[in-house]
Amino acid sequence: MKTRLIMLSLLAAANLAHADMLGKMNSRKPGRYVPETAWQEQVLPLPAYPTTAQWLELDTPVTVKPRVFIDSNSLLLAEDRTVRFTLRQLSSSGIDNISLEGLHCGQRTQRSFAFADTVGQRWITSSRPEWRKLDSNNATVLTVIKALCPEDAPPLSAEELANNLKQAAKRR
């Protein structure tokens, strides 16, 4: 037992010494390793309320109850590499739920920027400004991310984003 404890202590000390040595090596060679800068969200104003939307219905699995649409006019690949779009969910009873959404494909996070007041035709800013991890139990969200960010890869251009949406749109 004592031997194991001594060996464990020696391994821990060696690990700390190695970490210290790596820190010194990096500081002696400037530019050898540049830490990645933290992601910074691009702040954009809310777009105009979608009065002339071009709704494309997504092909959804049978487990998704509402019909799901994305306004192709609202698609935006922001400089911060997030995808912004207007989402419309239409219930079986005909009730519209429209929101301005964002996806950070590489991080698998989402954000709701605003919700539509369909009577007053205006946006109401979301009270939850944080980016949240995608809910793997939410079939609607998974359908949207699969449509806009196939294979969880962020689109490289606005054209690629538009093509992703067209390919995911329901064929009628």
Annotate each predicted stretch with a short phrase:
Residues 10-12:
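Short, linear, compositionally biased motifs with a strong N-terminal bias
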Residues 2-8:
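Sec-dependent signal peptide recognition
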